[in-house]
């Protein structure tokens, strides 16, 4: 029972990171009907932005963890800067790789090829810049056990990640449901032509959608480094597959579906790896993705929720 509780907690933490990245996939698909395969590289850019901030602030891997109060201040700075850089990168990606194709009414295949090309370009650029090496991230917060249930341990670092990520999800949900920008995103998602007739600036809405999705990926990159403490040029690939699987599992194009899919995948991965071994965790993502696409491509929530989109 204690092992089950421990695996559940770990699965929820992993799922929270997946969820923040999956939101970028589902938001873009909602407004453009485009699978932005370069989104995983926006996450990767975020990890290196986090590293850059810690280097500028003078933190290194041989330093002791920070006190919780100072950690909150420093980590907030890291998240804000990483989110800004990732968000700006996502907006630039939309401007360079997708906007001209959209204005020319190019086929979805053209946009898909552009997305794959952008992804490969970013991977190769960072491979050359970082010399294909792993980059360590300093331990900013001590992994102190807050409480224990039998042999299951709940440490403050992962609990902080889970709570912070959930807060971001709630804020995003409220932004989409209750703000003018959110109404614009939902309008474009449901019917772009009608949205134009109603006075919605579609280009601005799409750009802001990429900004939001990219910023969430940047925040996710900070949480990822807090948990795993290293990155490299291709760090976004497997995590991107898991996040995309989460979006498909819940019903791509639907925010709450993506969140549910992410937590479900995190739990499934954790339970499966406890039985099969950790190395099988990513295999589980591929298997689930294939099964969902074959059996229920609209996601586990079905057509009714899928029509709701964002």
List the model feature ranges, each with a label:
Residues 41-45, 99-126, 235-248, 264, ...:
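Pore- or pathway-lining transmembrane helices of multi-pass membrane proteins that form conduits
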Residues 4-55, 92, 96-106, 110, ...:
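Single transmembrane alpha-helix segments in multi-pass membrane proteins
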Residues 152-231, 255-260:
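Helix-loop-helix "hairpin" substructures at the membrane interface of multi-pass membrane proteins
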Residues 120-149, 274-282, 301-307:
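Extracellular/periplasmic helix-loop junction at the C-terminal end of a transmembrane helix
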Residues 193-197, 201-204, 276-310:
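Cytosolic-side transmembrane-helix boundaries in multi-pass membrane proteins
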Residues 62-114, 118, 260-265, 296:
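Alpha-helical transmembrane segments within multi-pass membrane transporters and channels
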Residues 1-21, 49, 60-77, 104-109, ...:
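Membrane-interfacial amphipathic/re-entrant helices at transmembrane-helix boundaries
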Residues 2-10, 14-17, 175-177, 206-246, ...:
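Inter-helical junctions in multi-pass inner-membrane proteins, predominant
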